[in-house]
Amino acid sequence: MEVERPADKQGNREKTVGFKLPDGTIRVTDKGFDYNVGRLNYKPNLDLYPEKLAHAFAKVEMKGGEFKHDFELLAKHMAEMKQTLSPEGKKLTAEQMLQVRDSLTKNFKFAAGVLSAESKDLLKSKTGTVWLSDDTLIKQFNSRDGQDFGIDEYERCQISSMLPSIYYK
């Protein structure tokens, strides 16, 4: 239920979610603790869900705020590191990339797509979930300069993951 949080030291009050206990009292979490922390990191095993539902989850994931935030943050950091390590704008060397990947990778992953049952058979894959890691994004930022490959292309890639026969030929 929506309640107003008690005033802080500056007298500010804000609306938040309260929890009504069986005795009728309403409890409010401390400021900053009124969200489900596990929700930020929860990644369901999409292989256990019907294909349409799994595909819908992946589609939302690639359009979501978490992916957008991480994409933009990694792009910014990668551009800064590339400018520092390679002022002439060339691709970073393998050694430089190891250094960059070690410093930027946070082991994030996003459901980039879901293979159909027939696509899994075609590719001889045991899993249908196509994951995009932050490490892969870092490597792509190094090699995609000038290709106009932005965040919107990842949504398009998610859709095409259902059609691997195009890539498999």
UniProtKB/Swiss-Prot annotation:
Question: Under what name is this protein listed?
Answer: Uncharacterized protein HI_1570
- Its source organism is Haemophilus influenzae (strain ATCC 51907 / DSM 11121 / KW20 / Rd)
Its lineage reads: Bacteria, Pseudomonadati, Pseudomonadota, Gammaproteobacteria, Pasteurellales
